[in-house]
Amino acid sequence: MNELSGWGRFPKIKTRELTPQSESELVEILRNSDSYIPRGNGRSYGDSAINKDLTITMTRMNRFLQWNHESGELVAESGVLIADIIDTFLPKGWFPYVTAGTKFVTLGGAIACDVHGKNHHKDGSFGNFVNWIEIFNDKNEIVRCSPDKNSELFHWTIGGMGLTGVI
């Protein structure tokens, strides 16, 4: 058991924490777990990303999978830090449209919390710049969703705090 907290350091909750490194490890964890919550890098306030039974920390699923240098579209695993995106792509002339108050938020956490930055009044929140997401749902299926395909799941997931499945 590990003791976890959010960014505010309170409350501290004892939980079993698993940190998968691959899709196959994640699927195995999900198949054998009834009660869990996904967690990014723990930068949410409060205890929103902690479950007393099982917390699945996604920070090791942190790979860039594809990048289009013309459009700037990035496909990445949910554990990638915004800091890594900035460090990798700023030298190429690209910067995320929306960043949170800390660059140590994961991509999945930014989606799950639908973070906003100082430009919220102009550009909106992080979810405005997400083209599609793959979700591990409660049936242990991987479902791709977008504004046009499985759109309800897409909109429920952006800002859904991890309750629709694991990004």
Please identify what each model-predicted range represents:
Residues 69, 106, 137:
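Short, acidic, Ser/Thr-enriched surface-loop or helix-capping motifs
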Residues 50, 58, 99, 105, ...:
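A short, structural micro-pattern
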Residues 2-6:
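N-terminal regions that are enriched for targeting/export leaders
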Residues 110-167:
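FAD-binding subdomain of flavoenzyme oxidoreductases
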Residues 8-101, 113-119:
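Glycine-rich N-terminal segment of FAD-binding domains in flavoprotein oxidoreductases
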